Amino acid sequence: ASILGRNEDGTPMRKPPLLQALAQDAILADTKLIAEAWDAGGLYQVGDFPAFKRWCEWNGKYRDDMREYLKGGLWCGKYAAKRLVGSPDIYDPNIRGKDASINFITCHDGFTLYDLYSYNEKHNEANGWGNTDGGNDNRSWNCGAEGVTSDPEVLHLRKRMIKNACATLLTSRGTPMFLAGDEFCNTQFGNNNPYCQDNEISWLDWGLLKKNQDIYQFFRYMIHFRKKHPAIHGLCQPATCGLMDVSLHGVRPFEGDFGEDAKVIAAMFAGFDSKRKKDEIGRAHV
């Protein structure tokens, strides 16, 4: 969507009239406006997209930082912690609100969630460009075998990683988004740029829904869990017990551990639920 904010010579505008018109159009008042805040010309506006108090943004930094953290990357704990609690370093909640960040780990571009934990490298040979198209910065991990395998340990680990990603996404503050088919392990067979594929590579394989019911039910449970705990959304009033709206924890309470090899982040969301007339406390561990 960033291309919509450039002027005649390609210079980014501070107040693009088209984006402003869309934001202020009365007919679109009840419509969700969501921007993929970058373009093919290299303009990257995550956290700086002209929002006019209406536009939300795909948070590409959430995708990158969470992918790196979930596969065990070093020195990324402090960044993952920020993404978990709503990316306040990118979106000031007092200015942009608490739902400006569209959190995602996968989307229509790139690997599916199953492929993210099945391939270390892209496999776009079928596109006809000698595997040169598509992004190379996938931050993926094949869990011990590249692509299709019958190894039960690898298959079990892949499903664990998918559950880790799902649980992380749905307990993060912000607005969650996941790719259709991720809830039943849909695959593109390692193709991370299937724009030209109208076949089994890009189609949803609904037969996998029955095969991977455990993953499907886990997604359903996590969606229910998120709806059940409004404190995760940041929509509650301040907690009467005095707990902070959001806090991070490590080995010691209220002390986040973000060292080189930090592997666990704990966040606590708190607030007063006016509907239930009591404090609501939610916890997330990644």
Indicate residue ranges for each PLM-predicted region:
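Active-site groove signature of glycoside hydrolases
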Residues: 1-4
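Short, flexible/disordered intra-domain loops and linkers
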Residues: 6-14
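Conserved alpha/beta catalytic core and glycan-binding cleft of carbohydrate-active enzymes
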Residues: 13-180, 184, 193-197, 230-237, ...
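A short catalytic or substrate-binding loop motif that flags glycine-/basic-rich loops and adjacent residues
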Residues: 96, 257-263
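Extended hydrophobic/aromatic segments used for targeting, binding, or gating
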Residues: 188-220
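Catalytic cores of secreted or luminal carbohydrate-active enzymes
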Residues: 209-247
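Conserved small/polar residues in nucleotide/adenosyl-binding loops
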Residues: 284-286
